[in-house]
């Protein structure tokens, strides 16, 4: 099978906002309308991003960037992110969400309840992009035209974000959705890791990989996206030990027997968390709150650290049992991280 090396990567809403903010600040301070800007990303890469429009007025400048999703079937592809910049009297950069950016109405998300749904990583990206232009105080307002309408077709309401979309992204880059080509890429990457290690750490996403790198050499870690089950099968045939390291929400799907964790394949996160919490003997009032939560992150806010550890131990043990059911000879380990990067449970390690 030949890998399709021409798969197109995209940019996150956070990267689009950072580019629009930088273009707006250049327009404000230099009275210059850029067609493209280059922004830094949290992973060290620099992205050159097209700018659709720049408007310059007295004391304010606005710029628009279209989100590009690459080969992902993303409803947000082509979405316009608009940022307006004006000077403020401090030396700080103040970022606010305007029309079309959602507000957080439930606890447990990365943004604080009551604030606009702009993740801390995106705020840092915007600040870093602007600081390449000026050290002056700037106020940035991020807007998404028709964001409230588009959000109706996303999962935002289910997690407590209303009135618009979320401005997110951990790397600034959107990788092509998991498919057979990507699975072939995983095979190649596993072979490379095997040249230096007799174990491999499988991490579903960026945050899991980042947290795992505190425990293992980063070169022994592979990010596999949604293809967790396939990746474990591939790895078990060439490595002495396979370690699955992830965050609760993703691994709760595996707990339920969902080994391809793409949303189209099923979702049993809160049901799984409730089931494990019952087995852990959590009090009825806590169980009620968990079942009514809109996200795993929110449910975790109702549990003590010790309760989370107890529940995640049950989850990890069940995952270990499931994996061994289709590969009894595998030397397998499960690590579940809390959302602050602390290890909640280690089973089989």
UniProtKB/Swiss-Prot annotation:
Xref: Pfam families: CbiD (PF01888)
Record's catalysed reaction(s):
Co-precorrin-5B + S-adenosyl-L-methionine = Co-precorrin-6A + S-adenosyl-L-homocysteine
One biological process term from GO is:
methylation
Q: Which domain of life is it from?
A: Archaea
Q: What EC number(s) does the entry state? A: 2.1.1.195
The UniProt keyword set, sorted, is: Cobalamin biosynthesis, Methyltransferase, S-adenosyl-L-methionine, Transferase
Which Gene Ontology terms cover its molecular function? cobalt-precorrin-5B C1-methyltransferase activity
Pathway note: Cofactor biosynthesis; adenosylcobalamin biosynthesis; cob(II)yrinate a,c-diamide from sirohydrochlorin (anaerobic route): step 6/10
Under Gene3D superfamilies, the record lists: CbiD-like (3.30.2110.10), CbiD-like domains (3.40.50.10720)
* Record has S-adenosyl-L-methionine as a keyword: yes
Which PANTHER family does the record associate with it? COBALT-PRECORRIN-5B C(1)-METHYLTRANSFERASE
- So what family is this one in? Belongs to the CbiD family.
The name this protein carries in UniProt is: Cobalt-precorrin-5B C(1)-methyltransferase
Q: Which species expresses this protein natively?
A: Saccharolobus islandicus (strain L.S.2.15 / Lassen #1)
């Amino acid at each position: 099978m030949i890998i399709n090396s021409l798969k197109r990567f995209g940019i996150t809403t956070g990267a689009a906002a950072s580019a629009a903010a930088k273009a707006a600040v250049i327009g404000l301070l230099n009275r210059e309308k850029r067609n493209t800007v280059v922004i830094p990303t949290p992973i060290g890469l620099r992205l050159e991003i097209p700018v659709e429009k720049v408007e310059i007025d007295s004391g304010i400048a606005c710029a628009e960037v279209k989100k590009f999703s690459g080969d992902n079937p993303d409803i947000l592809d082509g979405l316009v992110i608009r940022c307006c910049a004006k000077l403020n009297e401090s030396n700080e950069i103040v970022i606010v969400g305007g029309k079309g950016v959602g507000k957080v109405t439930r606890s447990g998300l990365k943004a604080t309840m009551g604030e606009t749904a702009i993740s801390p990583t995106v705020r840092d990206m915007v600040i870093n992009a602007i600081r390449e232009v000026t050290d002056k105080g700037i106020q940035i307002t991020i807007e998404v035209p028709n964001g409230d309408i588009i959000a109706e077709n996303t999962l935002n309401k289910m997690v407590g974000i209303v009135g618009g979309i979320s401005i997110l992204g951990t790397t600034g880059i959107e990788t092509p959705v998991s498919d057979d080509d990507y699975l072939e890429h995983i095979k190649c990457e596993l072979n490379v890791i095997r040249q230096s290690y007799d174990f491999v750490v499988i991490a579903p996403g960026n945050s899991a990989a980042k947290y795992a790198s505190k425990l293992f050499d980063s070169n022994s870690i592979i990010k596999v996206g949604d293809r967790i089950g396939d990746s474990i099968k591939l790895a078990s045939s060439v490595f002495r030990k396979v370690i699955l390291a992830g965050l609760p929400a993703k691994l709760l799907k595996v707990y339920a027997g969902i080994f391809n964790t793409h949303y189209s394949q099923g979702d049993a996160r809160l049901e799984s968390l409730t089931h494990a919490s019952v087995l852990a003997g959590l009090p009825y009032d806590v169980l009620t709150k968990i079942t009514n939560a809109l996200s795993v992150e929110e449910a975790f806010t109702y549990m003590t650290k010790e309760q989370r550890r107890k529940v995640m131990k049950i989850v990890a043990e069940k995952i270990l049992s499931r994996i061994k059911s289709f590969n009894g000879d595998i030397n397998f380990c499960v690590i579940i991280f809390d959302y602050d990067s602390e290890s909640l449970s280690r089973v089989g390690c």
